[in-house]
Each structure stands twice: as C-alpha cells, then as structure tokens.
Design a protein with these regions (language model features):
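Short C-terminal tail/terminal secondary-structure segment
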Residues: 1-8, 152, 230-231, 242-255
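Alpha-helical segment proximal to the catalytic Tyr-Lys
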Residues: 132, 176-180, 239
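Conserved glycine-rich Rossmann-like NAD(P)H-binding loop of the short-chain dehydrogenase/reductase
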Residues: 36-50
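Substrate-binding pocket helix/loop in short-chain dehydrogenase/reductase
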Residues: 75, 103-104, 108-116, 211
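Active-site helix of classical SDR
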Residues: 127, 163, 171
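Residue(s) in the substrate-gating loop at a strand-loop-helix junction
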Residues: 147
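Conserved glycine-rich cofactor-binding loop
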Residues: 13, 20-21
C-alpha cells in the first residue's frame, strides 16, 4: 500500500482566504504543490505579493479574488467568480482573520463587531457559500483556522479568543449537518507561528522566552507546520476525519 499517494489533491479546486501572506500563503502553496488549482481570497486583490505568479509557475491555475470577509457583497462576488471560472469547488481553507489586542475594559463595540464579522461571521458565510457547490457535488473538504486561543485564555485578546473558540464549535456544527453529503469539516488550531503577524511580538526576547516556556517542544512553529496539516485534512488520507480541531501547539495546551 502506497500511503504517500493519498496525501494529494490532484485536480481539485481550492479556495484559501487571507492568502496573501503568512499561514494563508503557506496553505495555498502547499495545496498547489499537491496538485490543486487555487482561488486566492484577498483583502486587496492587487496585493497578493506575487503568490498567483508563484502558483502558475508550478503549472497550476491561480484566481485572485477581492474578498474582505467583513463585506458580504465581496464574499458573494467572489463566489460568483469561482462559479464562472471553475463551476466547482472542492476545498476551502478559511484562514482569513484579525487578531486585535485590547484589554476587555477598552474594547469598543466597533472593535467587537469587526472581529466577529471577519473571524466568525466570515468563516460561517464562506463555508455556507462553498456548500452550494459541495452539496451538489456530494464532495467537499472545509478546513477552518481556529487557534490555541480558542482553548486557553490570553489576556488582552478576549474577543479574538472568543471567535476562535466559536470556530472550533462551528466546525462541529457544519460537520454534523453536512456529513451526509460527503463533506468533511475540520479545523486546525496553531500556537505562535513565525509569520508577518507575529514577527514584531516575537522579536522581543522576553516575549519569545515566555512563548518558548509554554511550548513543550521548546520551539516556535513554521508556516509549513500548519500548511502540512491543512493539506492532510484536505486529502483522501483524512476521509474518515470530520468535526475535529487539530491542535498544532507544540504541547502548550497539555500543561
């Protein structure tokens, strides 16, 4: 039995939101390397940082899409483009999100609403729109980006933690309803990963020392650690896995 042959997505169509940098970029590249054509959900369609070009250089197709998840009209327009160009969608990686830092007493209603609209509402309605393709196809793979912050409390990030906990449970709800359509819905929950979003925080030696003291493996993750898990969950190798959240936290949450 050739197990490695099952970790591929050859010929599939995948949408990755928040694809321009960090984890989204790594996921898009991993899926393309494994054989998928990629629709790139971007907050600014003109700023993909060369990602579409890189994917096309692999011999895969790339479709940049304007997709600010706080704007429902952009979500609808993006799916119209997916229908026009591909008329099908096999894989969705709900990566786009925001992580504002603010103590609870300083959180404004606008802060609260915006974080929920991108992280939770956006994930819900992107998945719902994907379902229109996947239910008809009787096939789909949805992978949501939660966080270890959905399992532990991080001071100064109450709203973010709440949304990531919500994504973990939203994952179960979608999985429960859509399993009968051969759609699996899972999530990954990373710890601190070296990305543009964590670069400034981890550049502070005290911050880095604190993070490393919490991680059992005593190392900070790389984007490929998350991308490899996403690829696995999107592949035939994970066809019997649904409704689960895979912690990629180096052991932080076991202590």
């Amino acid at each position: 039995m050739k197990h490695s042959s099952e970790v591929n997505v050859q010929g599939k169509i995948a949408l990755v939101t928040g694809a321009a940098r960090g984890l989204g970029r790594a996921c898009a590249l991993a899926l393309a390397e494994a054989g998928a054509d990629i629709a790139l959900g971007l907050r600014d369609v003109n700023a993909d940082n060369g990602l579409a070009k890189e994917i096309k250089a692999m011999g895969r197709k790339a479709l940049p899409l304007q997709m600010d998840l706080s704007k429902m009209e952009e979500i609808h327009a993006a799916f119209d483009q997916i229908k026009k160009h591909y008329n099908r969608l096999d894989i969705v990686v709900n990566n786009a999100g925001v992580a504002p830092e603010n103590l609870i007493e300083n959180v404004t209603e606008n802060d609260f609403d915006y974080t929920l609209s991108v992280n939770l509402k956006g994930t819900f309605f992107v998945s719902k729109a994907a379902g229109a393709f996947m239910i008809k196809q009787q096939y789909g793979r949805i992978i949501n980006l939660s966080s270890q912050a959905g399992f532990i409390a991080l001071p100064g990030e109450a709203v973010y933690c709440m949304t990531k906990a919500g994504i973990a449970h939203l994952t179960k709800c979608f999985a429960a309803e859509w399993g009968k359509y051969n759609i699996t819905v899972n999530a990954v929950a990373p710890t601190f990963i070296y990305t543009p979003g964590t670069e400034q925080y981890l550049a502070n030696e005290e911050n880095k020392k604190h993070v490393l003291s919490k991680i059992v493996l005593e190392k900070i993750g790389e984007p490929k650690d998350v991308a490899n898990a996403v690829l696995f969950l999107a592949s035939p190798a994970a066809s019997m896995i649904t409704g689960t959240t895979l912690l990629i936290d180096g052991g932080w949450t076991i202590l």
